[in-house]
């Protein structure tokens, strides 16, 4: 048996270090790539996603040589027409040609090699010396998918482009025995945006994605059933597409070439790459809008305190909390909420509900899983994943199973579970936001109109969110547990990588629907808080004026006992949620009128002697006060509402003083949406659709990162890192935070207990 060191030395010409976990010849200190895999996770998730999107938007040409392709490269080539692909001939051409020539040489020698002189799979006992005909037959029998007339049966264009890129990247490593000219033709097809139609279904991603990849081979060989789409949707035959890139005659596949093209995990890995790109962005978005949820709910930002999360040790949780803490730091909403809680500490529970308070603990593990899946897929798209592997250096073909796409199936199952968990949290927060029992004074359903009896706001959207959540949670079920034995029990275990990636892509799309609905609701809540604040100011002003006019002074300017009522009356206004009465502010059955009257009655009882005199009686003033209040308040409330609708409210919108403002500004100004109201014809779905399209087109990424401008990727309070530690610290993971903190304090002899 050849020693590992000899293998490394023999292959060092073919493999170079890339910084990813893709080296064949790892250093002696890291022979199994565990250290390299761990180092790839260094730094924050935020920094990783930022680098990813910077690369995605900044890419103009993607140069590939087999070992340094990234998730963002795949997404950019798949989605952005201005991005071109270039094969790195200097790095890869010689090794590609060497492996191709090796196959032909061995064929001439009569060497028995799987897929070159043998049958396939369970029928590999058959033999032939007609190598070219064997490859032709391979492509013919693998063209077993169904395209049909229904577009739903065809793999999406961006996934197919990604698959062409990933497959080419794999073949560039020179272990597959395929000609350089074939890879160059795929490059030209990509750059001309000529995309073959591949069947959506029919692969188990072991032995690779045989069926869909055979349709790429069908294009290259000009099979009569090959169909190709141009960028503008024109359909043509494979032969016509090849002529458009300068190939007058389709390829006649040489021995091994057909097998090299089809026997790999590239379709599943390609779609998984796109899924990972989206999942990372959406995870970050969910963290920021969870902070925005805290703002509009007048929440308590204490849940982001760094010590709480440092004591839990999980990096994903710590980062999620740190991001939320940064967004909330200095927020005008949080300053206002602190005053509200101080003024009336019993108005809401001591602690916020789990959907907000434990959002870092909930989102953190999802971020860790998504990061892990992303790195696993990035290793896969830089792997050699066909069979046999041509080892030119040792003059042999290695028969193995790198076509098994288990990394794709497993990582996509895990990622999809995390996507569903994020969606579940978004639904929990949304449900709290639209429920007037929990949302801190916002109207039921976030109704934006003046008449709640004719405005049901986001009631339909909440029903839709329940539907999305149910479907998303259904999709959370694993795909890989449903493996069926295939191909005469030769492929008795298989990864279902592409199937799992497809289900994950569905989950991503549903999460986009949920986030667009939720972001619409958050912007609605921001507008309602602005309206609430201006309405409250109007009501307080009128109540104060009416109290002074009717209760404070007599006809001759003398001071009356009722002058002491004003402060308590204004306290009632402060404590009463504006939207509980503002549609009819003087309605006798509404809480504001009742509580104002109660204040006057209480003062009347205290004014015992004064009640005997009609001029100083507070009881006698109640009808006068209420009549004057009705006369002034109703028209002033209407004027305040009119002023708000025109955008001329006197009080500024607090959101402008918040780090979450870029998202709000994006939805309202850049996308041109407005407050939803029953008085307007536009429906919630029309606004949500605009936001959904913007998220799907990656337009939300720029404002998302603006929310985090200046964040250094660390916890806010550096002193947390310098807490005194007990020698028992490392054994205290199971203790409560309070007990652990006490132990830390006792361990410091210089701690000042005064």
Swiss-Prot record:
Q: Its pathway?
A: Phenylpropanoid metabolism; trans-cinnamate biosynthesis; trans-cinnamate from L-phenylalanine: step 1/1
Positions of (E)-cinnamate binding: 263, 351, 357, 387, 459, 487, 490
Enzyme class comes to lyase
Q: Could you give a single Gene Ontology term from the biological process aspect?
A: L-phenylalanine catabolic process
Q: Where is the active site?
A: 114
Record's comment on post-translational modification? Contains an active site 4-methylidene-imidazol-5-one (MIO), which is formed autocatalytically by cyclization and dehydration of residues Ala-Ser-Gly.
Q: Which reaction does it catalyse?
A: L-phenylalanine = (E)-cinnamate + NH4(+)
Enzyme Commission number(s) = 4.3.1.24
Compartments (UniProt record): Cytoplasm
Family matches, as Pfam families: Lyase_aromatic (PF00221)
GO CC term (a single one): cytoplasm
In terms of SUPFAM superfamilies, this protein maps to: L-aspartase-like
Record's keyword annotation contains Transferase: no
Recorded hits in InterPro entries, A to Z, give: Aromatic_Lyase, Fumarase/histidase_N, L-Aspartase-like, Phe/His_NH3-lyase_AS, Phe_NH3-lyase, Phe_NH3-lyase_shielding_dom_sf
Question: Crosslinked positions for 5-imidazolinone (Ala-Gly)?
Answer: 206-208
Residues modified to 2,3-didehydroalanine (Ser): 207
Which UniProt keywords are given for this protein, alphabetically ordered?
Answer: Cytoplasm, Lyase, Phenylalanine catabolism, Phenylpropanoid metabolism
Disulfide connectivity for this sequence is none
The record's section on CDD domains has: PAL-HAL
Instruction: Provide a Gene Ontology MF annotation, just one.
Output: phenylalanine ammonia-lyase activity
Looking up PROSITE patterns in the UniProt record yields: PAL_HISTIDASE
Describe its partners and assembly state: Homotetramer.
Similarity comment: family membership: Belongs to the PAL/histidase family.
Role description: This is a key enzyme of plant metabolism catalyzing the first reaction in the biosynthesis from L-phenylalanine of a wide variety of natural products based on the phenylpropane skeleton.
Recorded protein name is: Phenylalanine ammonia-lyase
Q: Which organism is it from?
A: Pinus taeda (Loblolly pine)
The major lineage groups are: Eukaryota, Viridiplantae, Streptophyta, Embryophyta, Tracheophyta
